[in-house]
Amino acid sequence: LSPLDDQSVPLEVAPLVSAINGLLNRLKDSIATQKRFLADAAHQLKTPLAGLRMQADLAQRENSSATELKQSLQLIGRASIRATHTVNQLLALARAESGGNSLARQPCDLVELAMDVLQDSLPRAMDKRIDLGYEGVETGSPGVKVDGNPTLLKELMRNLIDNALNYTTSSADHPGVVTVRLLADRFGHVVVFQVEDNGPGVPEAERDLVFQPFYRALGTEADGSGLGLPIVLEIALQHQAQVTLEPAHPGRAMPGARFSVRFTSLT
């Protein structure tokens, strides 16, 4: 995709050549981005699949004890779950990116959707001993409906809650807390969905990077594919919503993170 020579063209066609070169440069950048994404996706899948193969080989050794066999099968199960999660996230990102104008929309009560996702997330929160709760307006309140796709909106909420649970830990000295919140301004036609935690937070230098595919916050060993927040951003864009990230508790040793998604509500 080499640019056209714009030095020896007639003055009349110079703007056209410049526009074509701009288009070629954007196309070149897009292709490079897709190549990086595919390479990252292949790497993310290669790691758990390599683990599956290694543990399968170990399980087939003739001298393997029952304990070793059980351990190998457990590791195979974990690796398969990780690979499946990555594939599901890739599919979710593809669905979000392909939405566009063809997105099937309907009036959606964000409180109702949030309650459904919260119920699904409670078992995992309980396993991690994290206090997962809700604050804000109630189902059916004025100003909480948006024009959107309920499946994708639930995916957005689920990924934000999963992200908070991934990066929040709980101990006797520091109980983990994740709060889901919905704020509505019926007169300003704005409804905001928030997920707030009291985990380590995201350094200011990384707050834009976390929305890039496969980016993982530095210095963390949290579970995840690195696709959850890019999915959130893409779904928000499809719904003309804005996503912001800020510390939940500035100044604390564990400042936490607060993700806010600002929608335009239906009248």
List the predicted regions and their residue ranges.
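Short conserved segments within the C-terminal catalytic ATPase subdomain
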Residues: 124-139
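Short conserved segment of the HATPase_c
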Residues: 202-214
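A conserved beta-strand-to-alpha-helix junction within the catalytic ATP-binding
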Residues: 10, 14, 104-119
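Conserved micro-motifs of the catalytic ATP-binding
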Residues: 68, 98-103, 143-148
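Short helix-loop "hinge" at the ATP-lid/N-box region of the Bergerat-fold HATPase_c
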Residues: 164-165
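Glycine-rich ATP-binding loops of the HATPase_c
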Residues: 240-251
